[in-house]
């Protein structure tokens, strides 16, 4: 299976299986708009599409390349004509992301396999950070999402980190980012103890449309 190290991609799936129908439907919802910032697109529509999809590993495994030496890999599925990034992330056992923002974009995440823990934080107090004073981040939610569950995230809700709580098995998730701001302009990582941030370029893709880079 591709999310195991050094494995080969399986043959192209039937174009109209349920997963690729989901990809098509997401593009239809985004339509002529510039992404979920547009008034004519409701994030709930994307959430509903993802909730309605029943994960079938044979449909998406060709995109799910993993590397146990990394916390996670980013595997591009679709770019939505420049309006979004649709990615499959493969989370190594017991590892996770740093605390980060979403570069004024929207993120909808569905767990395809395993489970993922989301820890949500409030924003640091900007006046303290600007003065060089610590502003520790406060946890506002800590939740584990199981296979099939969907969640939504944006900067209006705060900051978060995602981790795979399973010490032995990979976890797989589908993420829609729209507009694809982080891919173009980068995003910020935050220190939990001080609240200080640093801007970074988006992590490189591990694979693109089923082909390992």
Swiss-Prot record:
The thioether cross-link between Cys-107 and Tyr-177 plays a structural role through stabilizing the Fe(2+) ion, and prevents the production of highly damaging free hydroxyl radicals by holding the oxygen radical via hydroxyl hydrogen. There is a cross-link at residues 107-177 (3'-(S-cysteinyl)-tyrosine (Cys-Tyr)). The keyword Oxidoreductase applies. Its cofactor is Fe cation. Keywords: Dioxygenase, Iron, Metal-binding, Oxidoreductase, Thioether bond. It catalyses: L-cysteine + O2 = 3-sulfino-L-alanine + H(+). GO terms for molecular function: cysteine dioxygenase activity; ferrous iron binding. Fe cation binds at residues 100, 102, 160. GO terms for biological process: L-cysteine catabolic process. Binds 1 Fe cation per subunit. It holds the Pfam family CDO_I. SUPFAM superfamilies: RmlC-like cupins. Its EC number is 1.13.11.20. Belongs to the cysteine dioxygenase family. This is Cysteine dioxygenase. The gene is CDO1.
